[in-house]
Amino acid sequence: MSKEKFERTKPHVNVGTIGHVDHGKTTLTAAITTVLAKTYGGAARAFDQIDNAPEEKARGITINTSHVEYDTPTRHYAHVDCPGHADYVKNMITGAAQMDGAILVVAATDGPMPQTREHILLGRQVGVPYIIVFLNKCDMVDDEELLELVEMEVRELLSQYDFPGDDTPIVRGSALKALEGDAEWEAKILELAGFLDSYIPEPERAIDKPFLLPIEDVFSISGRGTVVTGRVERGIIKVGEEVEIVGIKETQKSTCTGVEMFRKLLDEGRAGENVGVLLRGIKREEIERGQVLAKPGTIKPHTKFESEVYILSKDEGGRHTPFFKGYRPQFYFRTTDVTGTIELPEGVEMVMPGDNIKMVVTLIHPIAMDDGLRFAIREGGRTVGAGVVAKVLG
C-alpha cells in the first residue's frame, strides 16, 4: 500500500505522440511503456492493445484515442496516441487530450512528411508548449550524413512554426528494436524519457492559476443579494476578495461576500468545485449566464480572434453541405452561445464537412477569452464543429 501512496505524490504530466502516418507513433508508445516498465516498474502495453483505440466523445465529436500511463523516477505520465490522422486533428482542436508536451515521431527513412508539418502547425495553433523529436527507424539508415540532413530538416520545420528548432531535443532511435528488447535501442527510449523529465517543465496546476468561474446560473436571495453558481475552472475564491464580472456587457467589479457548496457556507471555493458565490451590490438583472467571475485584471473580453476549427463530417452528425464566407453560426463558449461571422483564409471559397481550417471569427458580443480557449460551433443547438482560439485579435 505504501508504494501506491508514494506514487500519487509525483507530478502528473500529460504528453502524446504526434507525426506522420506509419512513422511509428504507436510502436514508440508501446516501446516507452515496455522499456520503462522493465526499468522502473509499471505495466507494459503491447502494440495491438494500443492500436485498437476505443471511441470517446469530446464536445459531441467521436474520437479514437488510446491512453497509456507510465512512470519515470520523478514523474507520472499520461500519454495519448491516436490511430488516424483525423483523430489527431480532432483531439488537438477539441482539447480532449490537453498536452503539456508532445513527442514528434519522424521516420529517418522518410524525413518530414505532410502530416509532420500539419501536426507541428496544429501544435502551434492549439498551444502545445513543448515538442521533443524521436527520429525513428534509425536502425535502417547507415548513412550518418542522411541522419544529420533529416535532423536539420526537422529543426527548420519546427523553427518555421515558432518552436525553438535549434534547441529542441532530438533522440535517434528504433522503436521496434527497443520493443524487441535490443539493449542498444532500449537505451534510446530511456534517453527520450530523460528529455520528457528535463525538457517539459512541470505544468502549473489549475488551483495555482488566477481565479475563474464560468457563470451557469444567477439567483436573487432576498435580504442577501445575488448569487451566481458554476464550477470553478481555476484558482481559488475567498470570502472578501474582489472579483470582476467579464463578458457580454461592460466589465463590472464586485466583492465576494460568501461562498457556499451544498447549502453549506465556506471560506473559499477551489478549482473543480461547484459553488455558489454571493456578490455585493450586484442586481440580478446586471449579470447573466455566459459571463465569468475572475480575479481582477486577469482576463479581458474580446470579440475577434483567429481560430483553428474542425467541421464535423455528415457521418458524425454534422452538416451535409459545405458553408461559404458569410456563414453565421453560434459559437458556444463555456456556458453560452454567441452568434459570430467568419472570414476564411485567402483562396478558400468553401469549407466541407470533415475539413479542418483556420478562420477569423467576429462575435456580436464580447466573451472573456485567452488564447487556447475551446469552443463548439453550433446551428440551432446542434454541434457542427469544434474550435480553439489560436490568437485573440480584438
Swiss-Prot record:
Enzyme Commission number, as recorded: 3.6.5.3
Binding site for GDP: D22, G24, K25, T26, T27, N136, D139, S174, A175, L176
Key words, A-Z: Acetylation, Antibiotic resistance, Cell inner membrane, Cell membrane, Cytoplasm, Elongation factor, GTP-binding, Hydrolase, Magnesium, Membrane, Metal-binding, Methylation, Nucleotide-binding, Phosphoprotein, Protein biosynthesis, RNA-binding
Membrane topology of the entry: Peripheral membrane protein
Gene Ontology molecular function, alphabetical: GTP binding; GTPase activity; guanosine tetraphosphate binding; magnesium ion binding; RNA binding; translation elongation factor activity
GO biological process: response to antibiotic; translational elongation
Compartments it resides in: Cytoplasm; Cell inner membrane
Keyword Transmembrane helix: no
Region (G3): 81-84
Free-text description of this protein's post-translational modifications in UniProt: The N-terminus is blocked.
Residues given in the record as Mg(2+) binding sites: T26
Main location (coarse class): cytoplasm
Cross-referenced InterPro entries: EF-Tu_GTP-bd, EF-Tu_GTPase, EFTu-like_2, EFTU_2, G_TR_CS, P-loop_NTPase, Small_GTP-bd, T_Tr_GTP-bd_dom
Family of the protein in this entry: Belongs to the TRAFAC class translation factor GTPase superfamily. Classic translation factor GTPase family. EF-Tu/EF-1A subfamily.
Protein name in the entry: Elongation factor Tu 1
